[in-house]
Amino acid sequence: MIIELGHYALVLALATAIIQGVLPVLGVRRGDPSLMGLAANAALVCFLLVAFSFAVLTFAYVTSDFSVKNVWENSHSLKPLIYKITGVWGNHEGSMLLWLLILVFFSAMVALFGRNLPETLKANVLAVQAWIATAFAFFVLLTSNPFARLVPAPGEGRDLNPVLQDIGLAIHPPLLYLGYVGFSVCFSFAVAALIEGRIDAAWARWVRPWTLAAWTFLTAGIAMGSYWAYYELGWGGWWFWDPVENASFMPWLAGTALLHSALVMEKREALKIWTVLLAIMTFSLSLLGTFLVRSGVLTSVHAFATDPTRGVFILAILVVFIGGAFSLFAFRASHLKAGGIFAPVSREGALVVNNLILTTATATVLTGTLYPLVLEALTGDKISVGAPFFNMTFGLLMLPLIAVVPFGPLLAWKRGDLAGAAQRLFAAAALGLLAAAICYYAVNGGPVLAPFGLGLGVYLILGALTDLVLRSGLGKVAAGVAWRRLSGLPRSAFGTALAHIGLGITLIGIVTVTAFETETVVEMKPGAVVDVGRYSLRFDGMREGRGPNYTEDAGHFTVSRGGVEVTEIWSSKRLYSARRMPTTEAGIRTFGLSQLYVSLGDDMADGGIVVRIWWKPLILCIWGGALVMMAGGVVSLSDRRLRVGAPARARKALALDHDDFRSDRPKIINVIDSKG
């Protein structure tokens, strides 16, 4: 009976979403506050209904209710509890319900924290959110019902794909969806503003926190997905330019551009049309990613094998929402007034360059991802666009972007001093070149671009720190005064610096592991020794083991350095009982920021086994940098001036330019300190 209650709750959520999408819009047209006020209440009710529905499905998984088809297809009574729970979203139907839950969650957050929004704008934003929720609720109920019953109920389930039985699955999809779906709020704000014909600095101020939150979650989701693929799939790589990986990366690139564009709009009321377009594009790319994963057009470890009719349904949603939003944009954009004028050399100019490069990079990834699909649809020819294309084109685009990033915070709004900014960045650039030279000579030449890329990473990190040092006046005033000035800076300044530092750390990791990792493929018998990097690995033999729902053959390796044993590594091949599906579990040991990675291959007729061993220098910088970027997003969100629904006093503080906090403006600092 409880399963039917979950299904009925989903139907009621659909009805509530329809009410939320219709009546508040009528209220706006009629100027009726009571109808407009329905939007917030309906959003909260819709969230509670979908949350109840999701809880029911989770209960069915935990109790192994195999009368539910979705549970039977993706669970097993022997599966550990954590994987029973994560199995809820380890399949198409359950993950779509999670998608819908997060969508209505964001609607509820707008309803709760958007109290200071203009009543008409809030009603329109929640109405657009409801239109999206209505479409996906119909999609779930009509094509992807997670509550379908099996009669009679099977005695045992088929189990979840063993590759997905990993703790990473508990974290990766929810984070990814929080990023994907979080951009729906930006989309709804853009559509609502176009409907009202009013877009100004206040609009950008309202959009920025939602953009920042979605960007932070998406950064976390992509990083977690990359690390999961690295350690779980046993292939030794961290990014494959898989079409589904690209489908999450494109909204991240566009969302990064939107963050910077919204800042220009907030400060100078410039780039209005462009910012609205980016808000629409970012969520459109999220919807495109949903289509690619669930339409059946891709074969990927990330994709769900689905009925093509589901792809047609999602394609219809794409056409309606993306086509409708762009049509509205084309009709209303010409009515938007142009914003402030600025010189090419200014902070606005640097952010425009940032936007141009990021959108070009997004278009490049989009072209490389969709071109094989379009070509196959038109001609029947199958081609693949692989890593060499993306590495070359995307890498070349990132070089000028990274060179420009440290200049942005050092340039003034409206008109900046390029020579002055370059002079202030001289030390960062010099130390970056020094790091590149040291790297080049340390590896006895080698690829020139690798030391150059490492030097760029160092330059980016030091450039971000330079901005904070200059704002505090460190070295020009007493240490106590510099500390007070530094602590008086807005948290968003620290968030920006952390995000740029994180990008630099990630760049160092990418360049180092790409250029200098070593791979050894060798047949080993017990007692065999192989040298990898600075370490020696001795194969000690295989041992059989058993887990809760699998058996495994685990290989034991002893790691030595300079003849001294330092650690051991276990790498295994598992066979899961229910599906009889083998998996490879890599053995990984960390040394500082570098890792030894061991993966077992095929058994040989002479009693040996093929072993693949990688030495991956500084690979943890890739995900460590992502963590720092995420921390930057969280710190920026904690800035009271950027909180949704911030009080008027805090909103007024936004009028203070970040340049007011530099060391040459002590009066402003003193005023802020006096206010506490």
Swiss-Prot record:
It comes from the Bacteria. GO terms for molecular function: heme binding; heme transmembrane transporter activity. It is a multi-pass membrane protein. Keywords: Cell inner membrane, Cell membrane, Cytochrome c-type biogenesis, Membrane, Transmembrane, Transmembrane helix. InterPro entries: CcmF_C, Cyt_c_assembly, Cyt_c_biogenesis, Cyt_c_biogenesis_CcmF. One of its GO terms (biological process) is cytochrome complex assembly. It is found in: Cell inner membrane. The chain crosses the membrane at residues 8-28, 42-62, 94-114, 123-143, 175-195, 210-230, 233-253, 273-293, 311-331, 356-376, 393-413, 418-438, 445-465, 493-513, 617-637. It holds the Pfam family Cytochrom_C_asm. One of its GO terms (cellular component) is plasma membrane. Required for the biogenesis of c-type cytochromes. Possible subunit of a heme lyase. Belongs to the CcmF/CycK/Ccl1/NrfE/CcsA family. This is Cytochrome c-type biogenesis protein CycK.
